Swiss-Prot record:
Gene Ontology CC entries for this record: chromatin; nucleus
Major localization listed first in the record, in broad terms: nucleus
The protein's name: Zinc finger protein YGR067C
InterPro entries reported in the protein's UniProt record: VerF-like, Znf_C2H2_sf, Znf_C2H2_type
Molecular function as annotated in GO: DNA-binding transcription factor activity, RNA polymerase II-specific; RNA polymerase II cis-regulatory region sequence-specific DNA binding; sequence-specific DNA binding; zinc ion binding
Record's compositionally biased regions (Polar residues): 782-796
Upper taxonomic lineage: Eukaryota, Fungi, Dikarya, Ascomycota, Saccharomycotina
Region (Disordered), start-end ranges: 782-804
Length: 804
């Protein structure tokens, strides 16, 4: 290839470009797409940097005011707000950049950020192959396309726009989006054998009449093109396509025989699946969906297609192929996740999918039930995605239809194995230290980015299983989301009976999400879709509860209960992660006060967590109660810093301003934030100072104080151990309301079964059965296990074999 040759070709007009980003920007102009919108004036832009400059100049006054409100100090406002002056290493500019990004609305989903680039690279490689052809062939192909386009555009202008009253789109744009939809189907190999056969069987007149007029097949593909281009009008076209598709589905010509009717039925099903797929793309990319679309029971419509297909799949020519079956499976699982309506039909449909060929002519069911026969490094990402989708369904079945699964089948083991598979897809990061600690190695290897939608679904499933296993005080009914349980657990110990469920898989997946949120280059507030926000909200609420209450002895948490958590190496990993994030990674930018904090916390972490020169359990009384000891001060400084970081870097930037949470949930998050800060400082009215033995719950009550409550409390002089964190001026708040705060999209619910009836059911979708209290954590040792105990072929990593 000659130097300087333009190797990136526009998929619309075949114009060549020398750089991929120039081609992508040019293609947006074809579709009229401006994905970046200013939250202040609602003006849209093609490029993010243009919008950032717009906010820093046009909305400068508003930006300065917002910055002053956020920092509480006008003197800290940067003098220059120009784009070229931003110093990414400055803490002030990082805050300003976060504020600017919070004013940007991006019509793209979290998962797309991580896997869209691979699709672009794949398309560019295909285009580079096309460049190798002679220019004469390119000109001939372009000429033929112009002739077909002109003929179709003329026919569409006369017939289609009149038939469907598409007043929001032109005939030219319809063809543009149609081509984008076709390209997407071809590149992703969706029903790849169906469309060549369909188009070859139609003449030009028939193509217009049958494909565009009598049935909205052409419009459905155009709707897919609009969805992937993030066009806001795609929801309007989707509603028109859906109503007309189902209106035409009952119109079979009586002259056709049974075989022709089956062919028409399969044709209808293919385009219905494409239509549902385009809706899923809209939901994942935060494209607003109208109330008229929300009224459709899409999951039931999808199952109405799949149920006869699974019963007589041999009669279907295209849908029965292996590749198409797994595409349909992924579509079905994702719509199930959004609808939460698993029923007997769902069980039947899933039974068909797990009997399909998965690897080496073996069905998926055999691969799962007989134990994975392949190591975690041998599976492709496509295979892992299928397994992750199936694990989510198995989790629902285990709760609702347990008799349908083998008695020895453990969903948790499958989740651990699949998480290990995704971890192995992560490139090995270079070591940043000559002598890294064991915790640093674990974080480097196991805290990963999200690889796909199915990877995020696996993280959700791991979290759902953990919440499902939590035991609340007095057997209180448990909701599936942690934040919905918060009014019940805010004043009680939550984890001391369930600390064994705080395992490495749970913690590393949680910290992976936290790590992505703390990385400003990963995504912004507007890039998070509702499902992302749901899980993030729950994880943040859980960690606020853990670090502000569960790890501090009080009237509700005894020292023995704290010790059960502190002997868990996974809790050590969390403490080390936050120590590394708050202090080590920012070591060059710490203020003088923060450096003093760092020195004390570093000694504590080295002595008790990294080297184990000192024992957390034997020194627990000093850590929890000795107000003047270095260990007490360092421990509480670390907990306070973690809570502050969760609040300032995640809760407020990402959750309080999220459009996907209702006002009640935001109010509860604010209460949780205030409660967490207050809980770290309030005096112990009834503090247990007795035995650390877990066998005794007898408490001798006395009055003590964790940190001074008064905002005017003077720090100790330099000759004594300082209280390095100034006490907060937070008013005591009333107990949090017991109202139930839920999301727009809930977690998996327990479906009322037709028969046999397993338990009493009601209207509350969050009601679940009480779980038997598991055995306590082994106080002597604990392992980071990366595999199930029953699977000898799985990779088993013992991270803390020497912790005693």
């Amino acid at each position: 290839m000659a130097a300087g040759q333009k190797k990136y070709i526009c998929s619309f007009c075949l114009k060549p470009f020398s750089r991929s980003e120039h081609k992508i920007r040019h293609e947006r102009s074809h579709a009229g797409v401006k994905p970046f919108q200013c939250q202040v004036c609602k003006h849209s832009f093609v490029r993010r940097d243009l919008l950032q400059r717009h906010i820093r100049t046009v909305h400068r006054t508003f930006l300065l005011s917002s910055y002053a409100s956020m920092t509480g100090d006008k003197a800290d406002i940067p003098v220059s707000l120009g784009v070229g002056d931003v110093d990414s290493t400055s803490p002030r500019d990082i805050k300003m950049e976060t504020l600017v990004n919070s004013m940007i609305k991006v019509n793209s989903g979290l998962i797309n950020i991580h896997y869209h680039s691979s699709n672009v690279e794949k398309m560019d490689k295909q285009q580079r192959c096309v460049i190798g052809k002679e220019s004469s062939s390119l000109k001939k192909g372009k000429s033929r396309f112009k002739q077909v386009k002109s003929r179709l555009e003329s026919s569409i202008s006369v017939k289609i726009l009149q038939e469907y009253s598409l007043d929001f789109i032109s005939s030219r744009d319809i063809l543009t989006f149609f081509r984008m939809g076709v390209s997407h189907l071809v590149e992703n190999k969706i029903f790849q054998n169906f469309f060549p056969d369909l188009f070859s069987s139609l003449q030009n007149d028939e193509l217009v009449e049958s494909f565009w007029i009598n049935k909205p097949f052409g419009l459905i593909i155009a709707c897919l093109g609009m969805s992937i281009s993030l066009n806001q009008d795609s929801q309007k076209l989707w509603f028109i396509c859906c109503t007309n598709l189902y209106a035409s589905s009952s119109k079979h010509d009586n002259d056709f025989d049974t075989e022709d009717i089956l062919s028409q039925t399969e044709q209808h099903d293919v385009f219905a699946l494409i239509l549902f797929y385009s809706l899923l793309v809209m939901l994942e990319n935060n494209i607003p969906v109208s109330n008229s679309i929300k009224k459709f029971d899409v999951f039931s419509m999808l199952q109405d297609i799949l149920k006869p297909f699974t019963v007589a799949s041999s009669s279907y020519h295209y849908l029965n192929s292996k590749e198409n079956a797994w595409f349909i499976f992924d579509l079905w699982v994702n719509i199930l996740r959004d609808s939460n309506n698993f029923n007997n039909d769902s069980l039947l449909i899933f039974g068909w999918f797990v009997n399909q060929e998965f690897i080496s002519s073996n069905p998926l069911k055999d691969f799962i039930y007989k134990g994975p026969s392949m190591s975690t490094t041998d599976l492709t990402l496509k295979h892992i995605n299928i397994l992750a989708d199936s694990a989510y369904v198995y989790f629902i079945i285990k709760k609702t239809y347990p008799q349908e699964l083998p008695s020895d089948f453990r969903v948790h083991d499958l989740l651990v194995y699949l998480n290990e598979c995704f971890v192995m897809q992560q490139p090995i990061k270079p070591e940043t230290s000559a002598n890294p600690s064991l915790f640093a190695n674990v974080m480097n290897a196991r805290i990963t980015d999200c690889k796909s939608k199915s990877n995020w679904l696996l993280w959700e499933t791991i979290w759902f299983e953990f919440i499902n296993n939590l035991t609340l005080r007095n057997g209180t009914t448990r909701n599936i989301w942690f934040i919905d349980n918060f009014p019940q657990v805010s004043t009680s110990c939550l984890l001391h009976h369930s600390s064994s469920f705080v395992d490495e898989t749970l913690i590393t997946t949680n910290l992976s999400i936290i790590s992505m949120l703390l990385n400003l280059k990963s995504f912004t507030l507007a890039s998070l879709n509702p499902r992302n926000i749901q899980l993030i909200t729950d994880i943040v609420s859980f960690q606020l509860k853990l670090f502000s209450s569960e790890l501090i002895a009080s009237s509700d948490v005894s020292p023995s209960q704290v010790s059960q958590l502190l002997v868990n190496p996974n809790v050590h990993l969390m403490l080390y992660f936050w120590f590394d994030t708050i202090y080590v990674q920012r070591q060059s930018y710490l203020s003088s006060t923060e450096k003093e904090e760092f020195e004390k916390v570093e000694v504590f972490v080295n002595d008790y967590i990294i080297t184990h020169q000192k024992n957390l359990v034997t020194d627990l009384h000093s850590i929890l109660f000795d107000f003047w000891s270095d260990s007490f001060i360092a421990y509480h400084i670390l907990l306070h810093a973690i809570v502050s970081s969760l609040r300032d870097n995640i809760l407020y930037p990402y959750l309080i301003y999220s459009p996907h949470l209702n006002d009640q949930t935001k109010a509860l998050l604010t209460d949780i934030s205030n409660w967490s800060c207050f809980a770290l400082q309030q005096p112990f009215r009834k503090t247990s100072r007795g035995s650390l033995s877990g066998a005794s719950d007898m408490k001798s009550f006395s009055v003590a104080s964790c940190l001074p409550l008064s905002p005017n409390f003077l720090k100790r002089d330099s000759n004594c151990n300082k209280i390095l964190l100034p006490p907060l001026d937070i008013k005591a708040i009333e107990p949090i309301s017991t109202s139930n705060y839920t999301y727009v999209n809930s977690a998996p619910k327990q479906q009322e079964k037709e028969q046999p009836l397993l338990r009493a059911t009601g209207n509350n979708i969050n009601l679940v059965q009480t779980i038997v209290v598991p055995p306590q954590v082994n106080m002597e040792s604990q392992e980071f296990s990366a595999s199930s105990t029953d699977n000898k072929q799985s990779k088993n990593i013992e991270i803390f074999s020497q912790i005693k």
